[in-house]
Amino acid sequence: MPIGESYVGSAHPIAVQSMTNTSTLQTEASVEQICRIAAAGGDIVRLTAQGRAEAENLRNIVAAVRERGLHTAIVADVHFVAEIASISAQYVDKVRINPGNYRLSGGAFEALIAQCRERGVSLRVGVNHGSLAKRIFDEWGDTPEGMVASAMEFLRICQRERFDDVVVSMKSSNTRVMVHAYRLLVEAMEREAMTYPLHLGVTEAGNGIEGRVKSAVGIGALLADGIGDTIRVSLTEAPENEIPVARKIVDYFASREGEFHVEHPERYSPTAFVRRSCVQTPIIHSELSDDFVVMESTSANPTAELRARLLDTPAEQAVVVKRRYDDSELEDVALKAACDLGVLFLDGLADGIWIDAPALSDEQIKDLELMILQASRVRFSHTEYIACPSCGRTLYDIEQTLAQIKARTSHLRNLKIGIMGCIVNGPGEMADADYGYVGAAAGRITLYKGREVVERNIPQEEALEHLIALIKANGDWIEK
């Protein structure tokens, strides 16, 4: 399907994309950032359109980008208001709407489809785990099944209207939820003869190596299954930093070859987490004992090879999966290992991890193994930060704030802390966090304990101290 002058789906290469974090009212700043993303190799760039003024200014941004000779596809990100989607569709190549806050009643979605068809604009039905509609939540809860139900309502309308230029996404900050949601969606679409392209991404992955590992675990699990037509690696960093990471992941899967026979396919459940063995807490290689056997892959398709061998291994045998990486850079080893091995833990198949990387120190390998286990949701060993990458809706410097919060709280190993730019997806995406720090207005922060608001409209310069005081008041603080 076309997105401007780009194509996604079928045999077309996997497209990589990012999202600006400038205000969409700031034309020059937004254009400059789009140019940097394009220069880094981005195929698609998304901008937030939270109001009429932002939607109307997309005209100026797109015109300025085209004047510079760039043909990068431009996407409007719309929440809540159908009118804003309609305005945006006049100027951009694609409109993303969120089924969780877009009304189906009244024919607004059909009207948007008609407008997009007339202009040659594509749509993205972008489901977020953290912002399911109340009626969906009441019936399904915040589950992968609920995410699929939300998407299918809109896809059925697209199918009925014979509108095919649609991309679908099922994003979550929880890698297991995200992977199961996409797999369930593929099954649901196949049952109803739908073949819409899929956009992959893990929301609120964070920054640094941890953010890259978390994205690679989720995205890699699906690419290993042959699922995915576009991807975004969401990082709480400059948007252009996302593109080289996404390219590395895409390129890593482009050269995979090899099929492996499975004697016991009935042992595999792709849409439910079932432990293969009785080992409850997977180990890292320095914890290896005689109770485990080591299963090493040397093939060009390590995920498929190890998954096949694990499925044919008796449940009473605990297995540590091993892979050697000769790369010299930590990021390259981290991305490859997360892509190769993370899914084996997401699916409950492996019992331990061994990364053989001669260029890395023992401490780096240990940290990386623990990061992959944590990103795969099977062993938590350090503070987890659910941090959004920010966009034009963010009203504070989230990258700097994340660094400050990490500096003060990274020793609190059993906690999950959400750092969110705004309330659109923030409270929902960090629903399983112990504490939350969410932008409420310019220079103002709201603090959460679990899902409950405990303090509103705190001046940003005071918010970190208030967060620490809240953690202490609930008995979760440990002195360094």
Label each region the model flagged.
Residues 21, 39-65, 99-104, 166-175, ...:
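Glycine-rich, proline-tolerant flexible connector loops at the mouths of alpha/beta enzymes
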Residues 128, 136-273, 290-419:
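Catalytic alpha/beta core domains of metabolic enzymes, predominantly
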Residues 11-29, 48, 73-80, 100, ...:
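Active-site mouth loops of central-metabolism enzymes
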Residues 16, 77, 125, 168, ...:
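Conserved, mostly hydrophobic/aromatic
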